[in-house]
A protein has these predicted regions:
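Patatin-like phospholipase
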Residues: 1-56, 64-475
């Protein structure tokens, strides 16, 4: 097992074997998906056998495409992570933009009198210089004085400027109130009305829509058809995957999200027919009921919930609105509507589920680097998305370390692919600044780093070494 405090990607003490049931786990948030894409490309080129793909957070995107042998869509020149549309993901919601625009416009309006005074500071020196050279000012000073008297008359700027500021701020308040009212539709909410206006600052809707748009390009091929709704497309996806499990390139799929209302993690799984019963079979009825509350079979009646699972995985807790999921009336939750989102700690649950499904070795890919000790400090971020990203990346790194330590008690073959250094934060879709190299790094470099790390940390030292052992008759 990899020592969590050792260098990134150090191999497991137990040898890798291509004969064993293998799972690929992708975990992370935001731009981590680009790192996953690079690692997937390397694993694809090396022909690494993968039986199960599992995802948490943005790792669900890579897992979805890898499960149907479509991972090339992630790293192609016109693929998911090389498209210009990626730069607009997780943008600021309308409310923060309205507030900023209203405040900026109000400041500009209030600054008009100061601008008028500043013009006088320019006019008087010009008038003085013109008089000194004998050119004459042409009444420049007199014209400015007349303008100032007119502008600062009681019925002019002193009256209209406060009205304009009030109009701008009032319009912004009405827009925020309308946004809060529309967001409150659906489930009953508690608390004063004005708290509805203070919604999470980022929007995750575009990320889920973009995922399904690229998936539709993969599924439809060259045919020119209108894209169906995410629910319909998810249903087609699950049917295609269920019908082709066992065929080359098609793999079992696991997704983990968090339910805010039931206070538990939910697992959405599409596994082979021989393992579907293992998802729910337990020794006692109480344990079986718990499984029905937490585990959903995407090959059965829960196939329509795949779209919900993807949307929730791409939902950043606190930073974006939780995704609502409505369960079937005959399901365990009896038609209730719950709020679901991502949770970094659900990686632990994902590893436990994989082990219960008979997985014998795991390849874990994370873009969150492990701190190697002292002398690793960097300047903290002060921008809004940068501050949120720093916490998320730190939490992801800690969860990876804890999940590996917990899973070690049940499995010794866990191989980790992660960068030693990553200056691109989870929300830096246009690239990030690297203090160590004193330059900006585009998102494409993170994809390339995932490719290189997969070869350097896993394929060459682990998979290559296993081939030598197989040739010598070792397992």
């Amino acid at each position: 097992m990899t020592d969590p405090f050792s260098s990134p990607g150090s191999p497991s003490f137990d040898p890798y074997s291509p004969r064993l049931r293998t799972a690929l786990v992708l975990t992370g948030t935001g731009t981590s998906g680009a790192y996953h894409a690079g690692a997937l490309r390397a694993l694809h080129e090396a022909g690494v056998k993968i039986d199960v793909v599992a995802g948490r957070g943005v790792g669900v995107v890579g897992a979805l495409f890898a499960a149907i042998d479509g991972a090339q869509r992630l790293w192609d020149e016109k693929g998911f992570w090389r498209s210009k549309h990626v730069a607009s993901l997780y943008g600021w919601r309308a409310a923060p933009r309205i507030v900023f625009a209203a405040l900026a416009l109000s400041v500009m309006i209030v600054a008009v009198p100061l601008l008028a005074v500043a013009v006088g500071l320019v006019v008087f020196p010009i008038d003085f210089v013109l008089k000194m050279v004998g050119a004459g000012a042409g009444g420049l000073t007199n014209a400015y004085v007349a303008f100032a008297q007119t502008a600062f008359a009681p019925e002019a700027l002193p009256t209209w400027l406060p009205r304009l500021v009030l109009l701008v701020l009032g319009a912004a308040a009405l827009m925020l109130a309308a946004a809060g009212w529309s967001a409150a539709q659906g489930r009953r909410v508690r608390g004063p009305f004005w708290w509805r206006v203070l919604r999470p600052p980022l929007s995750a809707v575009d990320a889920a829509d973009y995922c399904w748009r690229v998936m539709w390009d993969q599924v439809r091929g060259a045919t020119q058809l209108k894209q169906p709704t995410p629910v319909d497309l998810a249903r087609r996806y699950t049917e295609m995957l269920a019908d082709n499990l066992g065929q080359p390139g098609f793999r079992e799929l696991l997704i983990a999200v968090h339910d805010l209302d039931s206070h538990r993690d939910l697992v959405f799984a599409l596994v082979g027919e021989s393992r579907r019963r293992d998802l729910f079979r337990r020794q006692t009825s109480d344990a079986a009921d718990t499984r029905r509350a937490e585990v959903f079979d995407l090959a059965g009646a829960s196939r329509d919930h795949l779209a919900d699972a993807v949307a929730a995985s791409l939902t950043i807790p606190l930073a974006s609105d939780a995704h609502p999921i409505t369960f079937a009336p005959d399901a365990y939750w009896r038609g209730e509507t719950h709020r679901i989102c991502d949770r970094p700690g659900s990686l632990v649950r994902l590893l436990e589920e994989l082990i219960d499904l008979g997985v014998e070795q795991i390849v874990l890919v994370s873009a969150a680097p492990e701190s190697r000790g002292p002398h690793e400090l960097k300047a903290p971020r002060v921008d809004g998305r940068g501050r949120m990203g720093e916490y998320i990346q730190s939490a992801d790194a800690a969860v990876v370390r804890d999940a590996i330590r917990i899973a070690t008690a049940r499995m010794s073959r866990i191989f980790v692919i992660r960068p030693g250094h990553n200056p691109i934060g989870p929300f830096d879709f246009q690239g990030g600044y690297d203090d160590r190299s004193d330059r900006r790094q585009p998102l494409g470099e993170l994809l390339s780093r995932g490719y290189e790390d997969a070869y350097r940390q896993f394929i060459e030292p682990v998979v290559g070494a296993s081939g030598d052992r197989v040739g010598q008759g070792m397992p």
